[in-house]
Structures are given as C-alpha cells and as structure tokens.
Amino acid sequence: MPIGYPLVKAMDKDRFISYFLINNALLNERVIFLCNYEDATDESIYIGMLLYLESENSQKPVSFYINSSITFPNLCFGLYDTILQIKADIVTICLGLAGGMSSLILAAGTKGQRFALPNSRIMMQEPLIDGGVNGQATDLAIEAKELMDTKEILINLYHERTGQPKPVIEKDLQRPRYFSAQAAKEYGFIDSLLMASNG
C-alpha cells in the first residue's frame, strides 16, 4: 500500500500556516532526493530542479541524495550532463542503492564531495535497450549499433569520473557488478564514507 506524499508544516512571519510536499520543502533547502524514474518526463523534473537551484544561487552547494536503480542510460545522460554543467557544487550521497545508471549520477558529483553511507550498495551494469527490440533485421542492426555506441559512451564517462582504466570498466560492465561503500570508494565512485554521527 502506498504511503502517499508526506506534508511539511511551515509558518511565515505573519504566523500563517501552510503545508508543503516534503520534496518541495527539501528543495527549498537545496536538497534533491533521486528515486527511480521511468521516462524522460521524470528526468526533466530533476533537471529542472537543478536549473532552478542554479538560477537561485550558483555559489551554494546542492545535496543530491540517491536511492535509485535507473536501468536505461538514455534516461540519465541529460541529468548527468546538467550536473556537470552547472556552477554550484553537487554533493552526491548514496543511501541504500545507486544501481545501474544511478551509479554514474553518484560519480558525477563534485570531486571530493561524493559520499555513501556505510551500508550502501553501488552497482554498475551494461546498458539495456529501453522498451525491447522488435522489427526487421535492419531495425535490429540499428538498435544493436546504438547499444554498442551507448556502451562506449558509458565506458568513457565511468573512466572520466572514477579514473579506472577503460579495459577494466569494459570488463566490469559485462555483468552486474556490486560494490560495498568501501569498495566503491576504492573504485572511484565516491570520495568518502559518511559514518554515523550518533555512535
């Protein structure tokens, strides 16, 4: 059963009480929470949040929390490019899982400001085709070439963000590969682990 969207209570200087969706309240604090999304419309919402925060103040960092497994690369390239284009520092934090293309988003954060909680998992995998493939042999050949081109792009992007050699990344993409938070740090997805502050 869905839990719905929690509301946050706020009071202005005139003691007028209003309620905001929790995502809107977090956005006011420059916090974005990435969960699974399924189409380009969802991706555009996250891109819009980043562009809005950039226009509000390009000097203040944005905290980008990730608990997501995005399967199809074409649904994250726009978000990835936006993260790298804006001037504000993007602090990426994995809590739970950064799976599939979400691991690339995690690695896209500002160097030195990419984190994971101790029990987080990071997973990288070979790109998949959105919606499956059908049609004539020529159509299949076109899709196969696109898939190989996408894989090459991913290898280059992971290389840029993690520093791992391209042959290592190509081998690691052949099957889903899971990393503990510590292993993700050693691989180059993140820079540090965030340890519990309450002991």
Swiss-Prot record:
Main location: plastid
Cellular component terms (Gene Ontology): cyanelle; endopeptidase Clp complex
Pfam family of the protein (one): CLP_protease
Subcellular localization: Plastid, Cyanelle
UniProt keyword Protein transport present: no
GO biological process per UniProt: protein quality control for misfolded or incompletely synthesized proteins
Cell membrane as UniProt keyword: no
Organism superkingdom: Eukaryota
Matches recorded under SUPFAM superfamilies: ClpP/crotonase
GO molecular function terms noted in the UniProt entry: ATP-dependent peptidase activity; ATPase binding; serine-type endopeptidase activity
Keyword entries, A-Z: Cyanelle, Plastid
Function description: Has lost the two conserved residues (Ser and His) proposed to be part of the active site. Therefore it could be inactive.
Family label: Belongs to the peptidase S14 family.
Assembly information from the UniProt record: Component of the chloroplastic Clp protease core complex.
Protein name listed in UniProt: Putative ATP-dependent Clp protease proteolytic subunit-like
Organism: Cyanophora paradoxa
Gene field: clpP-B
